[in-house]
A protein has these predicted regions:
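Outer-envelope beta-barrel architecture signal
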Residues: 43-49, 84-90, 152-158, 197
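Surface-exposed loop/turn segments flanking beta-strands in extracellular/periplasmic regions
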Residues: 4-19, 109-127
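Residues that define the transmembrane beta-barrel architecture of outer-membrane proteins
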Residues: 28-34, 64-73, 137-143, 183-189
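Residues on the lipid-exposed face of transmembrane beta-strands in outer-membrane beta-barrel proteins
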Residues: 34-40, 75-81, 143-151, 189-197
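Transmembrane beta-strands of outer-membrane beta-barrel proteins
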Residues: 48-54, 89-95, 146, 157-165, ...
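Extracellular loop and loop/strand-boundary signature of outer-membrane beta-barrel proteins
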Residues: 18-24, 59-65, 129-134, 171-181
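Outer-membrane beta-barrel translocator domains and adjoining extracellular loop/strand segments
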Residues: 2-9, 59-66, 101-108, 168-177
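Transmembrane beta-strands of outer-membrane beta-barrel pores
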Residues: 1, 40-44, 53-59, 94-98, ...
Length: 197
């Protein structure tokens, strides 16, 4: 993401609660993903499942040597049915997220402080300086509902979704002390009318 003052991976996910320093530097990234799913028809009902997984490793080869490992797992299940010339669906999502990150210094000149950022340019003074490792974890979930007219028919189409994920930042060097929690809530909705063709 080329973001200064950041020694954590997934900046867009955990911002503003990142580990940071004044030097920064170039990073290397490895990312592995897989995704799979299936759908089964049972009479008028359709049941679908999907699983996505992402593993990421980010590191620097010069001081400060940040290293972050991310695992991100999402499981979805949904059920759908055709009723009154419309297709209706209801789904649910479970999300599991973990990131471990740390910064090491190997040069003889010594270390610089690492800052536990709090947003708007502020940092957590009590836990900054020598606490150069943290991990993030989250268990979230969501649900969505939708409907649309059958093929060749007109009518109302709609969708709505809600997702909630609380990300905790935990200092492993202080007996797994949680120092921040980021609550991410997303609402989405769409409403429309399909003209019959």
């Amino acid at each position: 993401d080329n973001v200064k003052w950041n020694a954590s991976a997934d900046w867009r996910t955990i911002y503003p609660y990142v580990l940071a320093d004044t030097l920064g530097g170039d990073r290397n990234t490895e990312r592995y993903t897989f995704q799979g799913g299936c759908a089964t028809r049972l009479g008028h009902w359709t049941i679908g499942e999907e699983l996505t997984f992402r593993a990421e490793h980010e590191w620097a080869t010069h001081d400060p040597r940040m290293r972050a490992i991310v695992t991100d797992l999402n499981a979805r299940i949904g059920v759908g049915r055709t009723l009154l010339h419309h297709h209706f669906a209801l789904g649910g999502t479970l999300s599991l997220y973990k990131q471990t990150n740390s910064v090491e210094f190997y040069r003889e000149e010594g270390k610089i402080p690492e800052y536990q950022m709090m947003g708007l340019g502020n940092w957590y003074e009590r836990f900054s300086g020598t606490n150069n490792s943290a991990y993030y974890k989250a268990v979230g979930g969501g649900m969505d509902v939708g409907g649309r007219p059958s093929a060749g028919r007109g009518g109302l189409l709609f969708s709505a979704s809600y997702n909630y994920t609380p990300y905790k930042r935990i200092l492993s060097s202080l007996n797994a002390l949680p120092i921040t929690q980021l609550y991410v809530t997303q609402w989405q909705g769409r409403l429309g009318w399909k003209v019959r063709m």
